């Protein structure tokens, strides 16, 4: 099972849907595809309308984000905090495909192949909204740090230590991971940096899912180390990843080959969310570097979108396949409320890390 969050509108175009279309919505709108021995179906679940979702209260409680490790107290204690880079990654496509072959009833001398796939994309969010959330998230972290009594570097100070850091052109990059040719899941996303804390190459999740990930991480660690050396404080480079859908796929080939793929709209803080930190340990030469990783995906139970889906079956008893295309149509005001709940919870978890190392903070 894969869980994720993302916007096709980021790429400036909604998902194109063909065939017979049914529009549905609700707390968990679902699109599924199933291929069995001799039939295939595509379905979409129902629930709340866009009007009902838009009428929900504007604020949402911060999501309970947690990390799987902690910043060492020797690095976090009694240091000025610098946040030279802050990124938000928006998942905008999630696809799943199941392939199953054979089975005792699969045919004479070789069996048959069944496949089911679901392709999803997030729509309904204006491009400028994504940038606004990134800017808000960065400002919120600084505000939470100051409210906790932690000294925070000014924008000028943070910019000065990052003057030689390799910035990402356009303060944005696109990424993808996974594949579905032989079954499995794939994810696409776009990462934007806060305008006051632009993305630094190697600290922004580029290369994730590919062979360049290791090289990007090496460059990012070197950049973080240089910034920490220059600052004399604690450098933080947060990366928040937001998802919009859960996708899953499964297949079996016991009696008859079957394949299933499903997508359910759900907002969440997704894996890939992390904080790179660096600071010089007392008595040591170069600065130490580490990463806080998200302990687990953090979903919200609140509805934020409807779903439009189309699909059907194709093939015959020796090779049946189904495919569903689904657009998760976000209600922007509700999505924004959940995005704010996500960054507030993420930032609160960062602040808690520092407070734990500073008993008086």
Annotate each PLM feature:
Residues 25-136, 140-153, 157-193, 197-268, ...:
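A structural "domain/chain start" motif
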Residues 22:
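Short, conserved catalytic or interaction motifs in soluble domains
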Residues 1-10:
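Bacterial N-terminal signal peptides that target proteins for export
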Residues 17-19:
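C-terminal motif of bacterial Sec signal peptides marking the signal peptidase cleavage site
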